[in-house]
Swiss-Prot record:
This is Uncharacterized protein C12orf56. PANTHER family: RGD1561648. Residues 157-166 have a biased composition (Basic and acidic residues). Residues 157-238 are annotated as: Disordered. The lineage of its organism: Eukaryota, Metazoa, Chordata, Craniata, Vertebrata.
């Protein structure tokens, strides 16, 4: 079987299919299409038929070749596993067998049993975490995710069974941070902006520090509506769900009408498989499927935070018809204003936060961000002015000014995290990263370096000493919080960059931008030791400080930290030896599975991937 090593990630190649999708999908759904690929489809309803598989941010579609109609087949929230099967399909000719990729998508849903289909009661059910692997198959890629509960609105017999091919027009909540109401030090008038901080009332980029206050009973309510495809008369009505304190069970709605045994007896889990046979050695659809599923898991976990979900919900009555032209015009205006000379840091931050908020709801702005490289270079150069130390000599003595600079830099890095997320199919992003490697090098050094903060100036007057001591303590505490938040934000962005290198090369050859290459570069940078040490110490504090449950943002951060540690252990001999020699005892006594299970609620979609990643890290440390 062929190995999927693409030379790039072309998202769209077929003009006829592209025109068809543009005509038959709503504009916001069309703009969210990540990739498509011709393949032979085998499923319960398809038997070795050549079709196009179309991947969006939430759904997998199928359409004929040539296209005539399009229908949804799998929602990413229902996926249990996406595997690359090492076999030789007998129905293919001998040459095609050698270059084929066999992709298996296992998905599940919780449905009412036949005798209970007409029941409309609200019930409790167990969350389906595990699946049974197919026998006698050699799986090349193991599952690394979690089964999402799927339910679609049950239809009455009088309702029309026509297919609904449109996704919900609710803006996508694909944010990369957990927001807080406003900026403490840098107020931006007229902006709906927020800068997360690691204290209990603040949020950090995709995660609050594990040392902060955790939620004891995190809500697991999802507010997003999954776009509907074929009506499913066997499914339960889609009702927001919550998990109880132990994180193992879900309750539909706000009442429990039956006992667990009665409710579960009326439910059954249905598991299905979708097999895609791609006749190509360069197809990247498998990587796209895995990446989109991983992105969805992170997004779904963050949406378990009610505050996070409410902040990015559109205001009632504020929704307008989606028009790509308006988004393009808005982006062009923001970009032109960013490039104006003599812009203050406050003004640049205001514009970037406006761009971030818009990109959270409209994927097309992410695509426009990477269409040309100038905006990425502009942001990296702007970060380099203030990190790891400020070029403004006044900031070396002025703590207040340095606080403002760090606030701005954290927000700027969060914007980059957002732009990296879900854009793995954009070849322009890969071209940008490859065109000027110096910008990428500078960004990596910035991320792993601890920001420099000013030293306190001596004061000789007794009263001034007392007053300045209080002020200094206040600024010192704020700076330490910002340093921790910066590390968490940098962790999120480094995770996204590592994914780029893990998913394939940048079109310049298989070795120039491989994961081993970036790890080799990082281990040559002296700050990496301190950065890795800070990650390990945060994990230790997070898992040993208390047994309160992690918040959704903290859970996402923990996953990203484990991913970075795994990359260091697997692809860098120097960093692997450092971790084993200096933190073996921590992994033995503090970083262990019982501690992880007590802190990580089962109701988070990212829990199962984190547990699997944790097992891999432990094996590499041994």
């Amino acid at each position: 079987m062929a190995s999927p090593l693409p030379s790039g990630f072309p998202a769209r190649r077929n003009s006829r299919l592209d025109v068809f999708l543009r005509r038959h999908l709503p504009p916001e759904v069309y703009d969210a299409v990540r990739a498509y690929e011709p393949c032979i489809v085998v499923s319960n309803s398809e038997n070795h038929i050549l079709k196009y598989v179309v991947l969006s941010d939430r759904l997998v579609y199928l359409t004929e070749n040539p296209p005539k109609s399009i229908r949804r087949v799998v929602a990413l929230r229902d996926v249990v596993a996406i595997d690359l099967i090492d076999d030789y399909p007998e129905f293919l000719s001998s040459p095609d067998r050698e270059i084929s990729q066999h992709i298996r998508i296992i998905y599940s849903s919780t449905v009412l049993k036949k005798e209970c289909k007409k029941s409309n009661s609200v019930r409790k059910f167990l969350f389906p975490f595990h699946h049974t692997k197919a026998n006698n198959k050699k799986v090349k890629e193991e599952k690394n995710g979690l089964a999402f509960w799927r339910s679609k609105e049950s239809r009455s017999l009088k309702e029309s069974p026509l297919r609904d091919q449109q996704e919900s027009s609710t803006p996508s909540k694909d944010s990369t941070l957990c927001p807080r109401p406003g900026l403490k030090k840098l107020s931006l008038h007229g902006q709906g902006a927020f800068r997360p901080l690691p204290s209990p009332s603040r949020r950090s980029s995709q995660s609050a520090p594990t040392t902060g206050k955790a939620v004891s009973e995190p809500s697991c309510t999802t507010n997003t509506k999954e776009p509907q495809g074929l009506p499913d008369h066997n499914s339960i009505s889609e009702i927001p769900f919550k998990c109880n304190g132990n994180g193992n069970e879900f309750y539909l709605g706000n009442s429990l009408l039956d006992s667990p045994s009665q409710s579960n007896s009326n439910l059954e889990k249905k598991e299905s498989e979708l097999h895609l046979y791609v006749i190509s050695t360069t197809s990247s659809i498998f990587l796209h499927l895995k990446s989109s599923w991983n992105n969805y898991i992170i997004k779904a976990t963050l949406l378990q935070d009610p505050f996070y979900a409410s902040e990015f919900s559109p205001a009632i009555g504020s929704q307008k018809p989606y028009r790509s032209e308006e988004k393009i015009k808005h982006f062009s205006q923001l970009k032109s204003e960013l490039f104006l000379k003599d812009n203050s840091l406050r003004r640049i931050l205001s514009l970037l936060m406006e761009l971030k908020v818009a990109a959270q709801k409209n994927f097309i702005l992410k695509r426009l961000f990477w269409k040309t490289s100038d905006l990425f270079y502009f942001i990296v150069n702007k970060l380099h002015e203030y990190l790891p130390e400020s070029r403004d000599k006044n900031a070396l003595q002025n703590q207040s000014q340095r606080v403002d600079e760090l606030v701005a830099c954290i927000e700027i890095i969060q914007t980059l995290v957002l732009m990296f997320r879900e854009t793995e199919t954009e070849s322009s992003r890969l071209n940008t990263l490859a065109a000027k490697k110096g910008a990428l090098f500078n960004l990596l050094v910035i991320l792993i370096s601890e920001p420099q903060i000013p030293k306190s100036c001596p004061v000789f007057d007794i009263q001034l000493v007392a007053d300045s001591a209080l002020v200094r303590m206040s600024f010192d505490a704020e700076l330490q919080k910002l340093i921790l938040e910066y590390t968490n934000t940098a962790t999120a962005l480094l995770y996204e960059i590592l994914l780029v290198f893990q998913q394939g090369n940048l079109g310049l050859g298989s070795t120039k931008f491989a994961i081993s290459w970036i790890m080799s570069f990082l281990q040559s940078c002296p700050p990496i030791i301190t950065f890795v040490a800070s990650i390990v110490k945060q994990v230790v504090r997070g898992l040993s400080a208390s047994f309160q449950l992690l918040s959704p943002c903290q859970a996402v951060l923990l996953y990203q930290q484990f991913y970075i540690l795994k990359s260091c252990l697997r692809h860098s001999r120097t960093l692997a030896e450092y971790i084993r020699n200096n933190y073996r005892e921590e992994f033995r006594y503090f970083i262990h599975m019982p501690a992880l299970q007590k802190r990580l609620p089962l109701c988070y979609p990212i829990t199962q991937p984190t547990i699997q990643l944790f097992h891999e890290v432990l094996k590499l440390v041994e």
